[in-house]
UniProtKB/Swiss-Prot annotation:
InterPro entries, per database record: FAD/NAD-bd_sf, GIDA_C_N, MnmG, MnmG-rel, MnmG-rel_CS, MnmG_C, MnmG_C_subdom, MnmG_C_subdom_sf
NCBIfam families named among the record's database cross-references: mnmG_gidA
Family note: Belongs to the MnmG family.
Annotated NAD(+) binding sites: 273-287
Oligomeric and partner information: Homodimer. Heterotetramer of two MnmE and two MnmG subunits.
Protein name: tRNA uridine 5-carboxymethylaminomethyl modification enzyme MnmG
Matching PROSITE patterns: GIDA_1 (PS01280), GIDA_2 (PS01281)
Pfam families recorded: GIDA (PF01134), GIDA_C_1st (PF21680), SAM_GIDA_C (PF13932)
GO BP annotation list: tRNA methylation; tRNA wobble uridine modification
Subcellular locations according to the entry: Cytoplasm
């Protein structure tokens, strides 16, 4: 191996969504950083759906933005349709989603990386890790070059021993058009990591010129479009519609006829697929009572005719793909430009990680993204950001940034991964968060911007803007608590409409706004000032007032849980020597090796009684 003549603080392996955030975070925090990618033309490529956000995923993007990451800004600059989902539900589950111009998204992110100080980009395939005295110190590449780094971040996506399946045909690939990484998995196994196998898939890309869109239902975005980033004032690019289509009984018969040549159902694919993003053949087999399945026909960009049929991923043979796509109403003459396929790949069970995303097996080595068993661009980007931050903090000799389950969806996800591991592709849902009323999209900046600024990621201008917003919220809350509606001065129509005609005592505007039938627009009939403040401030004030009781209750729950989360469990604790623990509990604790009592309490089979025993043992140990 030829040693490269420059050593780095942080080396990031992989240029997908996790790798981009990791590299940018480390470089922006002042670390000399190297990003290695098998293909520099595929930086931040959207391998599957051309969209960012969605339920719970939008929360992750907002949190990435609040901490100083790039994903939200990138989609704001390249999005071609923006929508807020769940608008008729409570604020905890409302979510942002945007269609992306796939090529513009990739190209802009590459430009950001290329112009970032202290960041080098190189095209290379990493084949092995260089480990000395239990710590990683560099990586070796297929071209025979060795790159040395104080910390290494692996963000390998689906590339490790990737195997693509189309019907009974299969061939090595990291994704369609890219070669796999064939040596790194072996190197990880030699280091002592447990490496598993997962599977995912993607639909065909269709020629939009061969689709009769007049026979499909159009779906338009919000007008005006609402940006993801707290620093984006407005979306300026042109917006386009998506279209809705449906499979039918004929489609399902065609799919069933091809199952004998499906790698999924013939036993060829061994990897576990994503539970919450099943292939179309999986849907047809698992839900035989359904006579149709919905698909969104999504444009891949404004300068291409390619479209993405969401929800129709498959690994069926190409002739079956031709037939079933053409069985859909409006798609009878459709041409496939790129076939659908499934891909198997290696991953490393994240139970082998600390909450910082540093591995427990090898020091100074961090894992982020699909290597940890997750699925989705947003999940990957969030992990990449945290891995990049913590690698930089390690180089700087500082404590890692650990987000708790009460801090962010990012914290929920990482805690799930490192506490429970992953045997199937992990996807974020709002239902995974026990404090979801505290972890809303709208308050991500209030929760995390201070942390991002403290570590040097949030720029000064953005921080001043955040602080001004925060002050305005506090001032408006204070004003609404003080200003009152007096019975003698009340508007009769307003009073009658909201059942206040018998009111004897004055009511503060806060008390009025707390009522479910009065929102800020209604309050503006008697309080003109409330409509003069920015919409984001007004939204935050209204949510805090209307949901204060529920928020206070969740804050009490957080405080009770905080004691468990702060109780550290030493890595060398011998569970076998603790009296009172059952054999099952000992086995679970030995297997999962939790870092805190909080983590231990979330391991299935570890009882409250066992946590009490552990707590007593830790107090006794610390007292010695």
């Amino acid at each position: 191996m030829i040693a490269y003549d420059k050593s780095y603080d942080v080396v990031v392996v992989g240029g997908g969504h996790a790798g981009c955030e990791a590299a940018l975070a480390a470089a922006r925090m002042g670390c000399c950083t190297l990003l290695l990618s098998i293909n520099l033309d595929a930086i931040a490529l959207m391998s599957c759906n051309p969209a960012i956000g969605g339920l719970a995923k939008g929360h992750l993007v907002k949190e990435i933005d609040a901490l100083g990451g790039e994903m939200a800004k990138n989609i704001d600059a390249t999005g071609i349709q923006f929508r807020i989902l769940n608008t008729k539900k409570g604020p905890a589950v409302r979510a942002s989603r945007a269609q992306a111009d796939k090529q513009q998204y990739r190209l802009r992110m590459k430009r950001i990386l290329e112009h970032q100080d202290k960041l080098d980009l190189k095209q290379a395939e990493v084949t092995s890790l260089l480990v000395e005295d239990g710590n990683v110190v560099g990586v070796d590449t297929k071209a025979g070059v060795r790159y040395l780094g104080k910390t290494i971040i692996l963000t390998t996506g689906t590339f490790m021993r990737g195997l693509i399946h189309i019907g009974l045909t299969h061939y090595p690939g990291g994704r369609a058009g890219d070669l796999p990484s064939v040596g790194l998995s072996v190197s990880l196994e030699e280091c002592g990591f447990k490496v598993g196998r997962l599977k995912t898939g993607t639909p065909a890309r269709l020629d939009g010129r061969t689709i009769d869109f007049s026979r499909l239902e159009p779906q338009y975005g919000d007008n005006p479009p609402i940006p993801f980033s707290f620093s984006t004032d407005k979306i300026t690019q042109s917006q386009v519609p998506c279209h809705i289509a449906y499979t039918n009984e004929r489609s399902h018969d065609i799919i069933r006829s091809g199952l004998d040549r499906s790698p999924l159902y013939s036993g060829i694919i061994e990897g576990v697929g994503p539970r919450y993003c099943p292939s179309i053949e999986d849907k047809v087999v698992r839900f035989p009572e359904k006579d149709r399945h919905q698909t969104f026909i999504e444009p891949e960009g404004v300068d291409t005719v390619e479209v993405y049929p969401s929800g129709l991923s498959t690994s069926l043979p190409i002739d079956v793909q031709w037939a079933f796509y053409r069985s859909i109403y409006g798609l009878e003459r459709v041409e496939i430009m790129r076939p659908a396929y499934a891909i198997e790949y290696d991953y490393v069970d994240p139970i082998q990680l600390h909450a910082s995303l540093e591995t427990k097996v090898v020091g100074n080595l961090y894992h982020a993204g699909q290597i940890n068993g997750t699925s989705g661009y947003e999940e990957a980007a969030a992990q990449g950001l945290i891995a990049g931050i913590n690698a930089a903090l390690r180089v700087q000799g500082k404590e890692p940034l650990i987000l708790g389950r009460n801090d962010a969806y990012i914290g929920v996800m990482i805690d799930d991964l490192v506490t429970l591991g992953s045997k199937e592709p992990y996807r974020m849902f709002t239902s995974r968060a026990e404090y979801r009323l505290l972890l809303r999209e709208d308050n991500a900046d209030l929760r995390l911007c201070e942390k991002g600024y403290a570590i040097g990621l949030v720029r000064e201008e953005e921080y001043r803007r955040f602080h001004a917003k925060k002050n305005m919220i506090e001032e408006e809350l204070q004003r609404l608590r003080q200003e009152k509606l007096l019975p003698s001065e009340a508007d009769d129509v307003f009073m009658e409409e909201f059942g206040l005609t018998g009111m004897q005592n004055a009511m503060t505007y806060e008390q009025l706004l707390r009522r479910p039938d009065i929102d800020s627009r209604e309050l503006a009939r008697i309080d003109k000032h409330i409509m003069e403040i920015p919409a984001a401030v007004r939204e935050q004030v209204e949510i805090q007032i209307k949901y204060q009781g529920y928020i206070d209750r969740q804050l009490e729950q957080v405080e009770r849980a905080r004691k468990l989360e702060s109780a550290k469990i030493p890595g060398d604790l011998e569970y076998a020597g603790l009296p009172g623990l059952s054999a099952e509990v000992r086995e679970k604790l030995q297997q999962f090796r939790p870092d805190t009592l909080g983590q231990a309490s979330r391991i299935p089979g570890v009882t409250p009684a066992a946590i009490t025993i552990l707590s007593i043992a830790l107090k006794a140990r610390n007292g010695r």
